[in-house]
């Protein structure tokens, strides 16, 4: 096989911390390479070096056998390397065609832009990807899956031979995921090479040809996917065997903590009723758009209910804002941690204590920094958050550690009920395992938990009961003992 890319002896330091140590990577023409490792293993740093976002400290990069120097993003693009980020880099207020050709517009004589040609070429590229999008449509009106195809179209326009895909299916529906896989297979047949970053093992074994595993900035193993098992890869990634992928603890739920009766928000969901007890995990399953997140945000006061009642501890409550919900003992962990759950340019410490300022302030509202430091350090130890210091900026942390900070922020309010919306999205298997154990710990403390997840095995194995939604309505409630993927999916698509 012919290598199209070789990265040899790549090392990188941030301050005194070595994040990559003598890492090698080989990518072959017309192959899909899975780049694996826990959050913080060095995957993103390695790819940012390849794409010209960071400069390497040591090592060499070879393309088609020739040594190259990639100093910036323009260099990477010149060499045919493109990265499709987890947080898509599109301009929402521009059209599909404008985004595809941004910075590469066709210019006529006298510097006027040839929009007709741009639209024709945009439609042609999208058609080749199996997409018949209206190229005049604004990107903000597209689904995440459609936006991703626009990103891929952009990369093909610049004749990219190497595509880096970072958690490409994290926010996609099942249908969009299947469409993406078809596109990847088509690109592979055309001789394109893809580096695929994902924590979803079933995807790795379906779509990838080769693998490379990093741990703590070092190369652990690389080879062909056909030569390893799921457990082999997990052990390489975490450096140990995870005895249970889903460490469920049986519990005896206590008294009722939350009751929702006929809750309705017009245009989102209607007549939703369910109960959550102390020390119980109630899982919410359903396809994207089923209304699960909307129900959660209404309970948390983000949306105003049209009708229905909410009871806490047997008493009806009025929740008009998230502040009301927090004061009544309800916390919500958002599915979108970067835009709703955290302020990424602020520090770990500032984010963690944001919802519990009263706890660290004196009677006139002045922050007691000694108390703040003590509480933050305690949470860092309790949740095993890996950071250089409490003053580290959130965007510098790995996805798993960002999620732990968001969870810590929830726990510092001493909630009676916590709503976890996609708590393990985009984090590695080791961090997932730690969050599952934390859920068990919360159960033991008698906290009621609502778990929303698009990963069916997660809902089935962590929940005590499962509520299924379809198009804004509850279509069934299934006990843990009776639940199977087939039963849940049947109700998730509106079946009986």
UniProtKB/Swiss-Prot annotation:
Pfam families, sorted: ABC_tran (PF00005)
Keyword Iron included in the entry's annotation: no
Primary site of residence: membrane
Enzyme class: translocase
Membrane-related topology note: Peripheral membrane protein
Catalysed transformations (reactions): D-ribose(out) + ATP + H2O = D-ribose(in) + ADP + phosphate + H(+)
InterPro entries in the record: AAA+_ATPase, ABC_carbohydrate_import_ATPase, ABC_transporter-like_ATP-bd, ABC_transporter-like_CS, P-loop_NTPase
Organism superkingdom: Bacteria
Keywords: ATP-binding, Cell membrane, Membrane, Nucleotide-binding, Repeat, Sugar transport, Translocase, Transport
Residues reported in the UniProt entry to bind ATP: 37-44
Family named by the database record: Belongs to the ABC transporter superfamily. Ribose importer (TC 3.A.1.2.1) family.
Protein name as annotated: Ribose import ATP-binding protein RbsA
Taxonomy of the source species: Bacteria, Bacillati, Bacillota, Clostridia, Thermoanaerobacterales
